[in-house]
Amino acid sequence: MEFTLEATSKNARACTIKTAHSTIKTPVFMPVGTLGSVKALDMEDVLDLLGAEIILANTYHMYLRPGDETVAKMGKLHGFTTYPKSFLTDSGGFQAFSLSDISKASENGIEFRSHIDGSKHFFTPKKVIDIQHNLGSDIMMILDDLVALPATGERIALSIERTTAWAKESIEYFRKKQKEGIGAEQNIFAIIQGGTDKAFRTKSATELCALDFDGFAIGGLSVGELNNEMYDTVEHTVKYMPKDKPRYLMGVGTPEDLIENIERGIDMFDCVMPTRNARNGTLFTSFGRLNIKGATYKEDAQPVDSECECLTCKRYSRAYLNHLFRSREIAYFRLATIHNLHYYLNLMREAREAILEDKYAEFKAEFYRKRG
Amino acid sequence: MEFTLEATSKNARACTIKTAHSTIKTPVFMPVGTLGSVKALDMEDVLDLLGAEIILANTYHMYLRPGDETVAKMGKLHGFTTYPKSFLTDSGGFQAFSLSDISKASENGIEFRSHIDGSKHFFTPKKVIDIQHNLGSDIMMILDDLVALPATGERIALSIERTTAWAKESIEYFRKKQKEGIGAEQNIFAIIQGGTDKAFRTKSATELCALDFDGFAIGGLSVGELNNEMYDTVEHTVKYMPKDKPRYLMGVGTPEDLIENIERGIDMFDCVMPTRNARNGTLFTSFGRLNIKGATYKEDAQPVDSECECLTCKRYSRAYLNHLFRSREIAYFRLATIHNLHYYLNLMREAREAILEDKYAEFKAEFYRKRG
């Protein structure tokens, strides 16, 4: 991975990340393709309509179905899904923790039951790297020890200790495998934990950033804390992260969250919000959110967002989308998803332009002004 | 509507139908867009990926939701849906008859309750023309009196009598409105009834074809009768239909049904089969049907049909589609629908080529040979 920090506007950064499969310009929002499909879209949509240079897939989901060995046989993620740009895969730890009825973290890893058939599985730091080798993702994530909040300080301390130990095991195994020619073109990121406690975040960031990872993520946020707690935690944690490597804030967030965290020095984001909300009827626009099922749109001939250049806004009226939503037509899901992801990706392109011109503060002010 | 009979190959016909919105080359299969959306596709798919020159919408459904007056305000079907080519709308009689809990046909029309909210409605021959004026379809269908089979000869005779009476009322009203400038660019087809009884079909066809309709449909087939009964009924009925007007077989059918009925002189078809079966996992190919959920496709790197030029076959493997289907990914529905409709529309293009070369019998033999 080649990383170039091109410009800053105060703490906001415009970078370029070059993987074996694409050149990613940051700030970047990565659409979520849990099962190797960005929900409701096909890969031509992702490429031609959205121009996404990187998407996510979930290790937990692909491991269970169709199975990472099947994916490997079918040409890894790139061959199987036909998406030729970059994939980032999470470690599966979060899903093992949150989707499984039983999930037990021990010193060696996380035991869980499949949410599909109840079968028992055990994820270890090495095991999730093996799986991600099979998936062939451009950026893989380490297994981290997650804690259900609220938790005692003792439990959080244990989580950080374990995450650091697993990170050491992960990076040693990953680099050793690379020397053997396995995953030579892949990259690996560590995940900083510590909740909203600054001392814990300092400790976790300091320990992990001393290791030879290709990039670093901030995990464990956007789990119910106040927005300001999230922003403060990011602002604090970023200080302990290297300037010459990518910074990824996992599972965040609203357009406002993106704007705020870019200002605090984050380069990469992912979230199910634009895709999931699209399916539920919530569309993001330059003037705020719009719930397309509202009766007020029944005979509204305007596009969702007159400033938007997406297929949906260029072609269809709110009235037609309102009708498709109310009639539960499948076509609605794709059109709404295209719009929301286009909005997110375009917002990132505009943020980048502003950083390159060192006008991020003005850009942010204008972003909020339009929302009134 | 301009109708040109270009070529025949025995009884099979290649025609051109020119409406105010498109030039339709027959034999033609019309994708079903019940609610103004071909399920799982958007109109760019229908235009650019399928090249469809005519699609269906259902009067019953559009009347109930969003309402034909809303559609009229939003620019009729063409403006509302953005599909710029031809629309055919049925009369709503079939849905009023089949989707409603209560449905009573009387001398004057059909009373029914909405399947959405239970509200009471009454369709008359004039009322469904008024609705179709609001929808702005290029081809509208008359209200016909449907009979649940099996029925007594007496009831079928009454159905034919009523359908003829309603047809007379319809064509008078439609032409009168045209003189007033309403529906001047629209066309209207009558629907021949009579089950699989040849005497009844003769009577219905003779009576209706004496009237000034723009085309004629054969209704009341593909309702559970044997294939040969359907084919025999079509073969018989076609003899009483004019050569210089389009012939439309409603609600039919499988690829085999299309091939057989083209041979018997049918020009136009519609059916939910390619779209509905796609969603259920059944894909149509040049070598027969394929159920994509089968475990045998889990690691099958081939396209669905190696002879197919659709987006789905050019880009994706059976393995990926199998995975999307099994994972219930929304993207599956669109990719499968694109394939099945592409197959149907392409089959019609090939049939047309064969007719133009007067080689329909050879084409049909080859069609069956490939299926083994």
From Swiss-Prot, chains A, B:
Its cofactor is Zn(2+). Pfam families: TGT. GO terms for molecular function: metal ion binding; tRNA-guanosine(34) queuine transglycosylase activity. Coiled coil: none annotated. SUPFAM superfamilies: tRNA-guanine transglycosylase. Binds 1 zinc ion per subunit. Keywords: Glycosyltransferase, Metal-binding, Queuosine biosynthesis, Transferase, tRNA processing, Zinc. Zn(2+) binds at residues 308, 310, 313, 339. Substrate binds at residues 90-94, 144, 193, 220. Transmembrane segments: none annotated. It is an enzyme of class 2 (transferase). It catalyses: 7-aminomethyl-7-carbaguanine + guanosine(34) in tRNA = 7-aminomethyl-7-carbaguanosine(34) in tRNA + guanine. This is Queuine tRNA-ribosyltransferase. It comes from Sulfurimonas denitrificans (strain ATCC 33889 / DSM 1251) (Thiomicrospira denitrificans (strain ATCC 33889 / DSM 1251)).
